């Protein structure tokens, strides 16, 4: 496959997805890949979501605060989106109660979005796959140093979705040697 395929078991269905880049495969061939991977014919028309990963520079501007996916969209996994909703609301309440300026909220949310983006990117970079141009593209990036840099940041222990222990597990899982 030319991308990241996933199944997420829910109570009433299984969510199946295929994250790919149109630089490496067209939509028609991606559907063929998806059907081949699931070993079944797609029974409902897949929802094709095209997006360019992006994040707002300032989530809080004057009296307007964006929450969750309104702040940015990095990947289609629901768990990340739900986390961003909960985290941004929790942080907003803390900032309001402490009288923190919007700049503090924006700085923290920028860090959380950057960490989320880096963590997802590292899953692609550290994959052992190299069977398609999609996966070979990510081999060009050196993830070893950045994984250990993230692991070494003590601030990760308390300030975001991916504490230092998660980065350590990522390095161990993908056998990233210490630089």
Per-region residue spans from a language model:
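Solvent-exposed, non-transmembrane amphipathic alpha-helical segments
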Residues: 27, 36, 84-90, 125, ...
């Amino acid at each position: 496959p030319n991308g990241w395929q996933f199944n997420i078991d829910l109570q009433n269905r299984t969510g199946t997805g295929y994250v790919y880049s149109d630089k490496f495969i067209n939509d028609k061939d991606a559907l063929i890949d998806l059907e081949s991977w699931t070993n079944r014919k797609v029974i409902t028309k897949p929802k094709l979501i095209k997006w360019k990963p992006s994040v707002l520079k300032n989530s809080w501007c004057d009296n307007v605060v964006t929450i969750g996916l309104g702040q940015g969209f990095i990947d289609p996994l629901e768990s990340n989106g739900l986390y961003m909703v909960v985290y941004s609301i929790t942080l907003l309440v803390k900032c309001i109660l402490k009288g923190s300026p919007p700049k503090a909220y924006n700085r923290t949310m920028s860090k959380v979005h950057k960490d989320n983006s880096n963590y997802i990117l590292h899953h692609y970079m550290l994959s052992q796959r190299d069977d398609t141009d999609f996966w070979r593209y990510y081999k060009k990036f050196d993830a070893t140093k950045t994984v250990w840099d993230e692991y070494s940041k003590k601030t990760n222990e308390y300030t975001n979705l991916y504490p230092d222990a998660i980065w350590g597990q990522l390095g161990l899982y993908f056998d990233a040697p210490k630089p």
